[in-house]
Regions:
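Polar, glycine-rich mid-to-C-terminal structural blocks
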Residues: 1-26
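Acidic/polar-rich alpha-helix caps and helix-coil junctions
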Residues: 28-225
Length: 225
């Protein structure tokens, strides 16, 4: 049974700045920043990025305080709750947007070019946050994404990162897309130093506890451990 995220929380796990930058690549159809950024992350400069929202106080300090380049996780938080270890936001095990993006990905893989239904599913997710249709994007090459299988696949990776950040799907996505492939790993390392210690064929799995291996002669330790 999953507990709901905490009211304010700890900072044992932080996001990386590239995620903020990716959210800010595109503006909405009315010229504002993607609202998912506001509801997903805390970071220095958020108040100026979203002047339409109140500059709330956290532990008595405004959330545009000088945090340097650090990025904190906000999704599911109650923002300013004084209570620890719980809140009344339910954790979504599977969201409709996740299903739409997975369906779009599957349709793309089953066809030579992205079918119209795949593009429709992608645009439904974008439309919910008032982003333009991918064909009309002012940042991405929408005409290529909507007609080229490989380009559509690569863009879906970005859309899933933005829509589903902090929802426990990223690792599954990376494994499905081939994190055990050197080219994919190099691309990840270029923006996220956390992957610098990732070793092909080893780090994709955790080691089996050695005590379990010692107690069971039929159990083989995972490769390279």
């Amino acid at each position: 049974m999953n507990q709901a995220p905490t009211g304010i929380g700890w900072n044992n796990i932080e996001a990386r700045r590239w995620l903020v930058d990716y959210y800010k690549r595109e503006q909405t159809t009315d010229g504002k920043n993607d609202s998912r950024l506001f509801y997903t992350l805390w970071y220095d400069g958020a108040a100026s990025d979203f002047p339409e929202y109140p500059n709330q106080l956290i532990y008595g300090s405004p959330w545009n305080s000088d945090w340097g380049n650090r990025v904190f996780i906000k999704k599911y938080s109650t923002d300013a709750s004084p209570l620890y270890y719980w809140n009344d936001n339910n954790f979504r095990s599977l969201r409709y947007a996740d299903m739409l993006l997975l369906y779009a990905e599957a349709l793309n893989e089953l066809n030579a070019t992205p079918p119209s239904k795949a593009i429709e599913c992608l645009n439904r997710v974008r439309n919910r946050v008032n982003l333009p249709k991918i064909e009309d994007s002012k940042y991405y090459n929408g005409s290529q994404i909507s007609t080229n299988k490989d380009a559509f696949r690569e863009h879906l990776k970005i859309e899933r990162a933005l829509e589903l950040a902090m929802e426990c799907v990223r690792w599954v996505d990376l494994k499905r897309w081939g994190i055990n492939d050197q080219a994919t790993l190099d691309e990840l390392k270029a923006r996220d130093s956390d992957f610098n210690n990732f070793i092909i064929d080893k780090s994709i799995r955790m080691p089996i506890p050695q005590s379990e291996v010692d107690n069971n002669p039929n159990l083989n330790q995972n490769d390279q451990y």
